[in-house]
A protein has these predicted regions:
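An amphipathic alpha-helix signature
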Residues: 8, 51, 90, 94, ...
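Short alpha-helical scaffolding segments that buttress acidic/His motifs in well-ordered protein cores
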Residues: 96, 110-114
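Hydrophobic alpha-helical connector segments
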Residues: 52, 65-104
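Amphipathic alpha-helical packing segments from all-alpha helical-bundle domains
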Residues: 87, 101-111, 121-141
Length: 141
């Protein structure tokens, strides 16, 4: 794991437990085992680090959906699922829910969004899109 990946992983863990305001750059750097100034070589600010985590996790969700053949955006074609065998559809839905709740990154990301949704409109919107709307969308097939 690269230093940047360690920073992202550690920051996600701290932000998901303590919230944005509760986790300091110093705490993150200390947990990674680097100097605070070294963290700034990878991310220019705490905000950039937080936004980088959110962007990365959304990209991972999109990769999962698209890699599984699931629609990700509202404009994606859902007609592909008409006439799909029930067993295949059930397996697809179960795999999707396991991803949402069992994947370690996703579980921490969900907690981060839950904590941040009241102060960060973008986090609220992403939480609704991924953990409410997507679940309903997958069930609607």
């Amino acid at each position: 794991m690269t230093t940047k990946e360690k920073i992202l992983d550690t920051a996600l863990e701290l932000f998901s437990r303590q919230g944005y305001d509760g986790a300091s750059v110093r705490d993150i750097a200390r947990a990674v085992g680097i100097r605070e100034s070294s963290l700034y070589n990878h991310f220019p600010s705490k905000r950039a680090l937080f936004d980088g985590i959110v962007d990365f996790c959304v990209q991972q969700a999109e990769l999962y959906f698209r890699g599984s053949g699931l629609p990700f955006d509202q404009g994606d074609d859902t007609s592909l699922y008409q006439g799909i065998p029930a067993e295949r559809l059930h397996a697809l839905i179960e795999r999707t829910f396991r991803y949402f709740f069992d994947d370690p990154w996703n579980a921490r990301f969900r907690r981060l969004l839950l904590l941040s949704q009241f102060t960060e409109p973008r986090c609220r919107d992403i939480y609704r899109q991924l953990y409410r709307d997507k679940c309903v969308q997958v069930q609607a097939f």
